[in-house]
């Protein structure tokens, strides 16, 4: 007995920006030219919750938020067994290799300040950094732009740590074990000067649009702060957003992570690292 044909997919959105949904195949967020246009290839189908999600890998980017030496390195008195370091290991061993294999571009989104940024920084941001207590050995959070002095790394050698989160300093750089994975000339790196990476004077939106990116997969820390702020702004700028739930972490209480994950159920999408790794990529003629 032949299976009944799949019903016509439901259109969610408008004529120029829409998803297609079918109870059988789940959500299609590949963004063909029109509802009646041929399917977009290549395409990648992943599990998300109780349904499936199909995206266009070359219109998608992994956004890695704030995985920087300042926030992660034990050399700066950060905890040696932090949730952020566990996320770094997962990115190194699972997520980034999966994105390379599936040909999903990567954008590294980092705090990177200029002297003008320090002068213009609002009290709310300065206060937030001053309240950071995710340090060991009684170390107190230095102010933005303050020189952290010499830093002793593994192996016993010492480097200049630089001023806190100022551009082109060691503490601002991508966390050392992850920096080794950056592909120069292929990966994107963008500086931000607020929790969100989409403020008016950042290059995030421009960098993504120049690559034709429509869908963003978020990883990094802190989930309820910089990740969530960037994700929400991205959604309002018409990007499709996916939270990689077990590749994000926060120093906040557990309920803060849970709240962001809960909100993603109604905003856009959530998936796990395993869902991404197991995603099925189908090649074909690309419809742009």
Q: Which residues does each predicted region cover?
A:
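Short, conserved beta-strand edge motifs with alternating hydrophobic and charged residues
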Residues: 64, 107-110, 190-191
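A short alpha/beta connector and helix-capping loop motif
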Residues: 58, 75-111
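Glycine-rich, phosphate-binding/catalytic loops in enzymes
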Residues: 79-83, 124-125, 235-236
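Short acidic, Gly/Ser-rich segments with clustered Asp/Glu that frequently serve as metal-coordination loops
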Residues: 68-74
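Serine-centered coil/turn micro-motif
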Residues: 74-76, 124-125, 169
